[in-house]
Amino acid sequence: IYYFDAKVISKGSGASAVASAAYRHATKMTADRSGVVRDYSYKAKELAHEEITVPDNAPDWVIERYQSGSVAEASERLWNDVEAREGRSTRHQSARYARSLTISLPIELSRDQSIDLMRSFLKATFADKGMIADWVIHDIDANPHAHVMLTLRSLGVDGFQLTNRDWNKVSNLREWRFEWAAFANDALERAGYDLSLIHISEPTRLLS
């Protein structure tokens, strides 16, 4: 089954990046700016894997804050940092926090094979372009799928910088969907399956 959906998590739609991360990591997180606590630990049985992928050339502060401690703790720091940065923006009322992807994983692949697939895809498609990818795999009732939250601002030596407008191009969604099919099909072939996911265009969802 091919499923690849992209949307933006924004303040204008009433969403919280920290709450969204708490749901994905099936844990309890606190949004520093609002003080709101979200606890999704009751969903822990669905969580199969969690990881944060950063660019190879990421500044030291990114490594220190988001590649240390537990993944859930690093995720909480990451999205609190993002919300704090957007809170300083002149357009904070319409702040855009993250790009969210939901991707169906081939059921033919093992857990380790799915993890390797996601690592390769996220590094090549997003991290190598400068984004941080906070991702998890949920698996319940034989429905393995990945949730990904991507940062929207470029990384500077001392913090998040300007929003990277190139990442908002509508053409990106078509490219990402095509690349996912290519990566997944390669993983299936290497696992010994004569199967292919077919990339079929869907009505384009605006990325901004």
Where are these regions (language model features)?
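N-terminal nicking endonuclease/strand-transfer module with a His-rich metal-binding environment
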Residues: I1-S208
